[in-house]
């Protein structure tokens, strides 16, 4: 029991009834303590002695309240901490719970917390936004709550079957608590005593009767209030009579006494009756509302409602004269709310369209109409505040129509000048005697339109029909860009012309011109006159168009970025149409490879795409070394997909946050611009095979030979590690199998692995001139197989006939002669040509296989001797240096020197 109640003598008189100040004297033995003086405020304060059950339950409810607050702010770490404390508090209250039962509020928090954690766990986007501590706490708490709730499965199931009952009890309890607190504030007679004094007091009989009556009157109210919390107005049976007596006697000293007069009794009874009446009225009102809701029988499913006729908003008051000033004022009013929170963007667009109609009906002139249409298009672009969100199809079509209408107006009225440099104060919208001036930039609208088109293509499934439908809109986009190009060529500045030219280039550079390609294959003499006329009417080829646009940018542009993009697109277009030497020369003259690392990421992606296309072009021309060098940087990184802007790698997603991922996804090129990655890898591996296999055969005994392609060697090692080799299936397996055949000089097997139906479908048929590429590949395989054969078996032959080699590799004799001559000149093959007999005579200057092994053994033994000498010096304590390269001796005045692979004994000299 608290020391507060034990202080003082039992014989003190109850002076609180007379209103005198209460002075508590210390008992004997408590000399060090000051007497406790109660002020008047403390005298009036009610003091309540709570049972152990109330204390434990209050501790639980406080923890539950903290958990719910943490759930609202998604603080899972706080939830975990409080849940652990809640479990400990529940353990302390176990004896009370065993007697009274598990409280319903405890079951509710367990069920709600488990549902809340499951929601967070299923929300993948929300989990990504969590910090590290919250994510870790979520996993831990989810496991703990699932394990903890197993002991309360039946209670949680019953609660979930009827959760409304608990909610109604809470609402009713809160209402009664609020009313009860207001009544207690007004009650001057200490009504709360009856809830505290739970046993019969041994004081006056009149007080006991009054308490008994109050308990009977308040029985219904207390039952409803204490139903959930499992509290009652009766005391616990476990309390002893002695403790009860002490509590009641001490409480009677500090609490106000119950009313004793008849007037006080009547007032208290009246208040209780009013409270019971209010409670009854609330229940009856709720029942009436439920009956009203249930009137009319069963519910019926409504198939369709009557469509609401949406009234058009009224722009102007009735009778208002529509003038330029009134319309411009209304336009400014609409634009003032643009971008503000809560603004309905669709309604704003409708208002602007209605304003255009009003301006046209009242003949206010094209100046006002053009100004409003500029704002309509800008509002369409601002409809989606999120940068990653793309336009809806209806909004996109509306945007295209508005831009076309605006261009029709600008082209039809040549006296209208638009530009960003025109201030709103200097606009001329209605004075037709002078040229009309409108603030706005048609180039900005077209660039934004192009960006929206790219965004639509990025966010559409590339394998769906919807993507094809959206791709058809590119014709409209290109037509608008072409119209704006012609308009700006007449009225635009040099900078604007360069920008619109770049837009035109970006929609042209990646397209293969099949018509121009067919015209190149068909000579003019072989085509009919109608075909020639049709070719003339089609306009200039894409090559001529690219040449004209790019040269203008090279000469007029003042910004490095536009010129760089134009050069890269020009190189890409040359490479796509197999103009290798023009593309290579333009790349070398531009020196872009020296400073491309300083460019922004979209330009770097364009550079990577151009280099890849350049490498594929070199491969088609049979220049395997140039193709390999162009593709080396992209393929050796292992991130070709990411470097070409065609997707993000899963392993790299962990290295960036969510914002960086969104930015990089916006940089991805649409699917119709993608370069086939399997074709790219196949071209690289075949080029590496044609270079690496002859090199490996020429330097087979060289332990220090370098690798031309690490990725190709990796594929070879993967193939060698397989214990059981079946027929090749993937593209990589075909290249590895072909490489093994080429090592043996078997060009026919190599050819069958590289060129077959499966490889044709995956790779070779994707080229514009597939037959030409296959013919080139067969020729390269024959030549490199011949080189490999000579390198591998030169030690076997004393001489070999070139005719034999020609028949073996199905090459004509001049080609064989040329290949062998180059090998001899480059000192790759130690041999000579005997012209009269057409034979190759081997000189046998290269060491044989046995000699190579002996040389390797001698080299390894020499390194072993050196290592042993170092270990010996270390044991003898010679830490200062190693003297084998000096003339003095050591270890019995003898030293060892490695010179040319053998040991020489040096003469003894003084050190």
UniProtKB/Swiss-Prot annotation:
InterPro entries: EIF3C, EIF3C_N_dom, PCI_dom, WH-like_DNA-bd_sf, WH_DNA-bd_sf
Domain PCI: 671-847
Ranges of biased composition (kind: Polar residues): 520-529
UniProt-annotated stretches for the region Disordered: 1-44, 157-299, 520-540, 883-911
Bias (Low complexity): 8-21
List of residues that carry N6-acetyllysine: 99, 641
GO molecular function, one term: translation initiation factor binding
Protein name: Eukaryotic translation initiation factor 3 subunit C
Organism: Mus musculus
């Amino acid at each position: 029991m608290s020391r507060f109640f034990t202080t003082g003598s039992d014989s003190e008189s109850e002076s609180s009834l007379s209103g005198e100040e209460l002075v508590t004297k210390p008992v004997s033995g408590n000399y060090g303590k000051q007497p406790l003086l109660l002020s008047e405020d403390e005298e009036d304060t009610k003091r309540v002695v709570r049972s152990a059950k109330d204390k434990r339950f209050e501790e639980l409810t406080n923890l539950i309240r903290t958990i719910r607050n943490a759930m609202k702010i998604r603080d899972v770490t706080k939830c975990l901490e409080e849940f652990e404390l809640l479990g400990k508090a529940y353990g302390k209250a176990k004896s009370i719970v065993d007697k009274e039962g598990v409280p319903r509020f405890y079951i509710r928090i367990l069920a709600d917390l488990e549902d809340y954690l499951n929601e967070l766990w299923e929300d993948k986007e929300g989990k990504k936004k969590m910090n590290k501590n919250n994510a870790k706490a979520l996993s831990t708490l989810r496991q703990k709550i699932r394990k903890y709730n197993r002991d309360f499965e039946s209670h949680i199931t019953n609660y979930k079957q009827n959760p409304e009952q608990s909610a109604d009890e809470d609402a009713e309890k809160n209402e009664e608590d609020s009313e009860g607190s207001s009544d207690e504030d007004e009650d001057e007679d200490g009504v709360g005593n009856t809830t505290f004094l739970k046993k019969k007091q041994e004081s006056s009989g009149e007080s006991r009767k009054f308490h008994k009556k109050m308990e009977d009157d308040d029985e219904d109210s207390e039952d409803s209030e204490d139903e959930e919390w499992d509290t009652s107005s009766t005391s616990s049976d476990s309390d002893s009579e002695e403790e009860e007596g002490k509590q009641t006697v001490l409480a009677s000293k500090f609490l106000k006494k119950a009313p004793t007069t008849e007037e006080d009794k009547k007032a208290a009874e009246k208040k209780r009756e009013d409270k019971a009446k209010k409670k009854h009225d609330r229940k009856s009102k709720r029942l009436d509302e439920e009956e009203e809701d249930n009137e009319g029988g069963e519910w019926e499913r409504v198939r369709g409602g009557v469509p609401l006729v949406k009234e058009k908003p009224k722009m102007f008051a009735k009778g208002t004269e529509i003038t330029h000033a009134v319309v411009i004022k209304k336009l400014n009013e609409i634009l003032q709310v643009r971008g503000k929170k809560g603004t309905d963007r669709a309604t704003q667009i409708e208002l602007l369209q209605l304003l255009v109609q009003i301006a046209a009906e009242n003949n206010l002139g094209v100046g006002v109409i053009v100004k409003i249409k500029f704002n309509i298009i800008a509002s369409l672009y601002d409809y989606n505040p999120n940068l990653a969100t793309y336009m809806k199809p209806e909004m996109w079509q509306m945007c295209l129509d508005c831009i076309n209408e605006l261009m029709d107006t600008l082209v039809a009225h040549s006296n209208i000048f638009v530009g960003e440099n025109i201030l709103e104060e200097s606009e001329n919208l209605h004075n037709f005697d002078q040229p009309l001036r409108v603030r706005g930039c048609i180039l900005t609208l077209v660039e934004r339109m192009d960006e929206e088109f790219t965004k639509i293509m990025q966010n559409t499934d590339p394998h769906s029909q919807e993507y094809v439908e959206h791709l058809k809109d590119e014709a409209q986009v290109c037509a608008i860009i072409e119209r704006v190009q012609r308009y700006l060529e007449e009225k635009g500045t040099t900078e604007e012309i360069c920008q619109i030219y770049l837009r035109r280039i970006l929609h042209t550079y990646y397209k293969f011109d099949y018509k121009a390609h067919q015209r190149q294959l068909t000579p003019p003499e072989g085509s009919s006159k109608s075909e020639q006329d049709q070719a003339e009417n089609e306009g200039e080829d894409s090559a001529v168009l690219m040449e004209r646009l790019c040269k203008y940018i090279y000469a007029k542009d003042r910004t490095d970025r536009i010129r760089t993009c134009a050069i890269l697109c020009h190189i890409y277009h040359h490479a796509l149409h197999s103009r290798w030497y023009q593309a290579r020369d333009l790349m070398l003259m531009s020196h872009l490879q020296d400073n491309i690392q300083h460019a922004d990421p979209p330009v770097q992606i364009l550079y990577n795409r151009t280099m890849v296309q350049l490498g594929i072009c070199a491969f088609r021309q049979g220049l395997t070394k140039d193709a390999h060098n162009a593709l080396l940087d992209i393929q050796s990184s292992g991130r070709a997909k990411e470097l070409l802007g065609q997707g993000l790698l899963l392993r790299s997603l962990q290295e960036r946050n969510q914002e960086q991922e969104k930015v990089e996804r916006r940089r991805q090129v649409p699917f119709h611009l993608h370069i086939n990655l399997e074709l790219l890898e196949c071209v690289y591996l075949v080029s590496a095979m044609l270079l690496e296999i002859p090199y490996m055969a020429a330097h087979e005994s060289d332990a220090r030979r370098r690798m031309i392609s690490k990725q190709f060697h990796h594929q070879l090692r993967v193939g060698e590690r397989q214990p059981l080799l079946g027929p090749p299936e993937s593209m990589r397996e075909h290249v590895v199998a072909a490489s093994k055949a080429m090592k043996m000089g078997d060009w026919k097997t190599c050819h069958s692995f590289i060129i077959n139906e499966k490889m044709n479908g995956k790779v070779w048929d994707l080229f514009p001139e597939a037959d030409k590429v296959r013919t080139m590949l067969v020729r390269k395989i024959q030549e490199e197989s011949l080189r490999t054969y000579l390198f591998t078996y030169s030690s076997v032959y004393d001489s070999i006939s070139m005719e034999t080699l020609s028949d073996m590799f199905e090459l004509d004799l001049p080609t064989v002669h040329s290949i062998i001559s180059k090998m001899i000149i480059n000192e790759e093959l130690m041999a000579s040509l005997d012209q009269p007999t057409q034979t190759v005579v081997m000189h046998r200057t290269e060491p044989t296989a046995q000699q190579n092994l002996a040389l390797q053994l001698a080299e390894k033994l020499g390194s072993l001797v050196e290592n042993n000498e170092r270990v010996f010096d270390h044991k003898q304590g010679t830490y200062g240096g190693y003297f084998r390269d000096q003339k003095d001796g050591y270890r019995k005045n003898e030293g060892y020197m490695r010179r040319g692979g053998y040991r020489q004994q040096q003469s003894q000299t003084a050190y």
